[in-house]
Amino acid sequence: MADHDQVLERTLDAPRDLVWRAWTSPEHVKKWWAPRPYQTPECEMDLRPGGKFYTRMTGPDGFDFSGTGCFLEVVEGERVVWTSALGEGWRPNETGEDCGGFPFTAIVTLEDAGEGRTLYRAVAMHRNEADRETHAKMGFHEGWGTCADQLGEVAAGPK
């Protein structure tokens, strides 16, 4: 891990194949991508290198944010890498456009954790300390942590 990275890990109470499905299906992503009470009414995913990754989040306070990224790597059932610095087809996004004011690259990995559980790891790589700090102040650990917990709930299904 580099100095400018944010890292989040969770052990989810769902098998890896179900976590993968929940992470890669737009209909499932809409259920967990934004920390409640925020919502994700829109999600588009072309799950291949160079493919588009688009989400739109809304909140009760009038918050409305959309972001377009680009998938860099997809390893079925194991790993997804995407960046906010690029849009569909590897086209650069403008700084601040779809980047939350700073570009980052996310690496999400899934590993079997035994007993039908999954080790979920998300790394947000930033270009410098200022961008990492901005992301931290936006609530990286709280927000991404809540979303990881929600991902686990969606993957596990109704109890």
Predicted features and spans:
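Glycine-rich portal/gate segments that line the openings of hydrophobic small-molecule binding cavities
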Residues: E42-W90
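A generic structural micro-feature
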Residues: A2-H4, L47, D61-F65, D98-F102, ...
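Short, highly charged C-terminal tails/helix-capping segments
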Residues: E42, V154-K159
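Hydrophobic ligand-binding cavity/cleft-lining segments
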Residues: M1-T40
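Beta-strand/loop substructures that line and gate deep hydrophobic ligand-binding cavities in soluble
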Residues: V81-T83, R91-E142
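A short, structured loop/turn motif at beta-sheet edges
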Residues: R16-D17, D46-R48, L72-V80, T109-L119
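Short, surface-exposed coil-to-beta transition loops
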Residues: D5-V7, T40-E42, D64-G69, F102-A106
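Hydrophobic pocket/interface hotspot
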Residues: V19, V29, F53, F71, ...
